[in-house]
Design a protein with these regions (language model features):
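Extended catalytic cores of very large enzyme megasubunits
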Residues: 1-652
Length: 654
C-alpha cells in the first residue's frame, strides 16, 4: 500500500488538530512531538501516520470527549498491529503512555507533587508507600535517585506490556487513580531492594533500577506489585508439608490462607496424611482420607481471594504409592461423585524411579497402594522419608508385609487414570522425587517431598510440629501458649533474566547482570514481609533464591538458531552453563562479603559433590569449586525457571 503523504506532515497536523480544542497547549505540543518521533523512529511506509489517521477517524463520533479521543488514538495504533507490521504495538504503547502521563501530570499538579521526594512523602502519608523508604533515605538521596530516571526507556514497552503494567503494577490511590509512572515504579522497587546496603547504597539503587528499567531482568509479580508498599510480601512460592494430625492439617490450611491473602502460590504435600479407611486411635476404618482435607484446601483457595483480585492457587501433591491415589487422580474430572471433587486445586503426583522402571519393563505388573500411617505402625518408619535404592528396598519390604493392607492395581491402570485426567484437566503435574533428591545440594540437612504450585522449586521440607500447650499467667492475664517446632516451610524469591534482551554470548556482561540479580534476590530475603513466621525462619536458614529465564525463543530467533538442530543444543548448554556459573560465583562472593547460609557445612557445595554430579570438570569450574569450598555460599538454592506469563508480557520477551 502506497501512502499519499510521504512526509507525514499533513497527517501529523490532522491528528494534532483533532486535539487543539481539548488539550492544553503544552500537552498538544507534546503530542505533536511524539507523532514526529514516531515518524522518525518508524520510517517504513507501513507505519505511515496516514494509516493511523484513517483508523483513528473511524472511531470518532461528534460526541467524542477528550478522553475518548486519546483512547481512540492508541486503540487505532493497536488495531493496526499485524504480522507484517508488528511495530504498531510499540507505536500504540507510546500513544498509550502519552494518555497516561497526561492524566498523571494533572493528578500530580492537583496534589502539588512537583518532585519525586514530595510524591513519596504524599504516598507514605496516604499509606500507599511503606514508611521505611523515607526512614532509610534522606531527601538528598531521593532527589539524587530521581536523576536516575530515564523516560526514554518507556519506549521499550509494547502496548500489551505497558497496558498490563499500568493496570496491575503501578501504585494507585484507594479510588484507583494512578500516581506512579512505570519508571518511578522501577525506581521505587530499586530503592526498596537496596535499602539495607551498607556500602555504595545509591550505586546499587542505580544498578537495580537500570537492570529493571532496561527490561533485562524481571522480578516476580509479588515483588513488582508489593515492593515499596506497606505490606511488602515479595515472595512467589511457598511449600508446606501437611502432617498427619487434626491440628497439623488445620494449621497447614491456615498457613495457606495467610500465604494466599498476600498473593503467594502454594504447594502442599499430603503424602503423610493417612488414607481413607485407616484407623484413628485404634478404631478401624475411621479415617476419611486425603480427599476430604483437599476439599477444605479447595474452599480456602476460593474464599481467600486476595482482596477480590484473584482466588488463591495451590498444588496438592500425593505419592504414587498412596492408597488414596485413584480418587486423587479424579479430583478435577467431571464424572463421578461431586463430593469427592476439588476443581480449584492442581493435583500433582510424586513418582519414584521404580514406578517408571517397572512400567518400561511391563505395564501389566501390579503396583501396590498403601497407607503411610499403617506403614509407620507396622514398620516404625515413614516410607516417604527415603528415596532411591533405600526407598525401593523398604517399599518392597512393605509389599511383603501382611500387616499392611494394600490396594492392588496394575501400572497400566494408574497410567490410564493419569492420562485421562491430563487430557480432561491438564493435571496431574509430575514430580520425579528420586531425581530431585539425588541432585539436592543440601541432602545432608533434609528431604524434598514435592514441589510448589508451578513445579520449579525443590527444597528441603519438614512438617511443623506442635510440642506443647501450656496455660500461663502474663501481666495478670491467663494465656494459652502453644509451642511448635517450625519445621521447614519452604519459601522462594524469584526473578527472571530476559534472554531476548541480553547479550547472552557476552560472558562478562552476563556475569555482571546475574551478579546484580542475585544480590537483589538475596536482599529480598531480609526485606520481605512474611505471611507466616515459619516461612521467615526457613528462608533465613537456607536463603534460597530462584533466578530463572524468560524469552528463550526470543533469544534463539535473535541468533538465527533453528530449533531442531545440534547448534541449538550446544547453544542452550553454553548459555545455561554461563548463567549457572555466574550465579554460583555471585553467591560465593556474597558469602565472602556477608556470610554463608547456616547449613553450608556438610552440603554438596562444601564437599564439591555438587560439581561432581554435574560433570563440571573444566579448569574454570574446578577453580570455582575451590573458591566455593573456601568462601562458602550465600544461598542454598540458586536457580529456578518459573513461569512468567505476566512479567514476560511486560518485558516483551517470549
Amino acid at each position: 500500500m502506497q501512502t499519499t503523504d510521504p512526509t507525514g506532515i499533513f497527517n501529523r497536523n490532522k491528528l494534532s488538530e483533532e486535539f487543539s480544542n481539548v488539550l492544553p497547549d503544552e500537552a498538544r505540543l507534546k503530542l505533536d512531538a511524539i507523532l514526529l518521533e514516531i515518524q522518525t523512529d518508524f520510517p517504513e511506509i507501513c507505519y505511515s501516520l496516514e494509516y493511523l489517521n484513517t483508523k483513528f477517524r473511524s472511531f470518532l463520533t461528534p460526541q467524542s470527549t477528550c478522553g475518548q479521543k486519546l483512547e481512540s488514538l492508541f486503540q487505532a495504533a493497536a488495531e493496526l498491529t499485524t504480522a507484517e507490521a508488528p511495530k504498531w504495538e510499540f507505536i500504540a504503547a507510546r500513544l498509550l503512555y502519552f494518555q497516561f502521563s497526561f492524566h498523571l501530570k494533572q493528578e500530580e499538579t492537583r496534589r502539588e507533587l512537583s518532585d519525586f521526594y514530595k510524591k513519596l512523602v504524599y504516598l507514605t502519608r496516604q499509606n500507599l508507600y511503606g514508611s521505611y523508604i523515607l526512614e532509610h533515605y534522606s531527601r538528598e538521596e531521593l532527589l539524587l535517585a530521581e536523576t536516575y530516571l530515564k523516560a526514554e526507556r518507556n519506549n521499550l514497552f509494547t502496548f500489551s506490556g505497558l497496558d498490563l503494567l499500568l493496570k496491575r503494577y503501578v501504585i494507585r490511590t484507594h479510588d484507583h487513580i494512578p500516581l506512579e509512572s512505570p519508571q518511578e515504579m522501577f525506581l521505587g522497587i530499586a530503592l526498596h531492594l537496596a535499602m539495607n546496603e551498607k556500602n555504595d547504597r545509591m550505586l546499587w539503587v542505580k544498578k537495580f533500577y537500570d537492570m529493571l528499567s532496561r527490561l533485562e531482568v524481571t522480578m516476580a509479580t509479588p515483588t513488582l506489585s508489593n515492593a515499596r508498599k506497606p505490606y511488602h510480601q515479595l515472595s512467589s512460592c511457598f511449600i508446606d508439608t501437611v502432617p498427619d494430625s487434626l491440628e497439623g492439617i488445620y494449621r497447614s490450611i491456615d498457613n495457606f490462607a495467610q500465604v494466599s491473602k498476600f498473593g503467594g502460590g502454594m504447594g502442599m504435600y499430603f503424602g503423610k496424611v493417612r488414607a481413607s479407611g485407616s484407623n484413628i486411635r485404634g478404631f478401624e476404618g475411621a479415617a476419611g482420607g486425603v480427599i476430604r482435607w483437599i476439599r477444605l484446601v479447595n474452599d480456602t483457595a476460593v474464599a481467600v481471594d486476595q482482596l477480590g483480585m484473584r482466588q488463591g492457587a495451590v498444588a496438592v501433591y500425593l505419592d504414587v504409592w498412596h492408597r488414596d491415589l485413584p480418587e486423587f487422580l479424579q479430583l478435577r474430572t467431571n464424572n463421578g461423585d461431586d463430593r469427592m471433587k476439588a476443581h480449584d486445586v492442581f493435583p500433582a503426583v510424586c513418582y519414584p524411579d521404580l514406578f517408571w522402571k517397572m512400567a518400561k519393563e511391563d505395564m501389566d505388573q501390579n503396583w501396590y497402594l498403601m497407607c503411610p500411617h499403617e506403614i509407620f505402625q507396622a514398620k516404625g518408619y515413614h516410607l516417604e522419608d527415603y528415596f532411591g535404592e533405600e526407598w525401593e528396598r523398604r517399599y518392597l519390604d512393605c509389599v511383603q508385609d501382611a500387616r499392611i493392607s494394600k490396594r492392588t492395581v496394575t501400572l497400566k491402570d494408574i497410567i490410564r487414570l493419569v492420562l485421562r485426567s491430563a487430557a480432561e484437566t491438564g493435571t496431574p503435574f509430575t514430580f520425579n522425587r528420586d531425581t530431585v533428591n539425588r541432585m539436592n545440594p543440601n541432602g545432608h540437612a533434609g528431604m524434598i517431598y514435592c514441589s510448589n504450585l508451578c513445579t520449579e522449586i525443590a527444597q528441603n521440607m519438614q512438617a511443623i510440629e506442635e510440642v506443647s500447650k501450656e496455660v500461663q499467667t502474663t501481666d495478670g492475664d491467663t494465656v494459652v501458649v502453644t509451642v511448635t517446632r517450625p519445621g521447614e516451610f519452604v519459601v522462594c524469591n524469584l526473578a527472571s533474566l530476559s534472554l531476548g534482551h541480553l547479550p547472552v554470548t557476552d560472558t562478562s556482561y552476563m556475569e555482571e547482570i546475574v551478579s546484580t540479580a542475585v544480590r537483589a534476590l538475596d536482599n529480598v530475603i531480609d526485606l520481605n514481609f512474611y505471611p507466616t513466621p515459619y516461612a521467615k525462619l526457613t528462608n533465613q536458614k537456607y536463603r534460597s533464591i530462584g533466578l530463572g529465564v524468560s524469552g528463550y525463543h526470543h533469544m534463539l530467533a535473535k541468533h538465527g538458531i533453528i530449533w531442531e538442530s545440534e547448534e541449538h543444543l550446544k547453544f542452550a548448554d553454553t548459555v545455561f552453563e554461563t548463567i549457572n556459573y555466574a550465579a554460583i560465583l555471585a553467591s560465593t562472593n556474597l558469602a565472602e562479603e556477608k556470610e554463608s547460609y547456616s547449613l553450608f557445612n556438610g552440603s554438596d557445595w562444601q564437599s564439591g559433590a555438587y560439581f561432581e554430579k554435574r560433570d563440571y570438570h573444566s579448569e574454570k569450574w574446578l577453580a570455582l569449586q575451590k573458591k566455593v569450598a573456601a568462601q562458602g555460599m550465600r544461598n542454598a538454592y540458586l536457580l529456578a525457571v518459573a513461569p512468567t506469563s505476566s512479567t514476560s508480557t511486560v518485558s516483551y520477551t517470549h
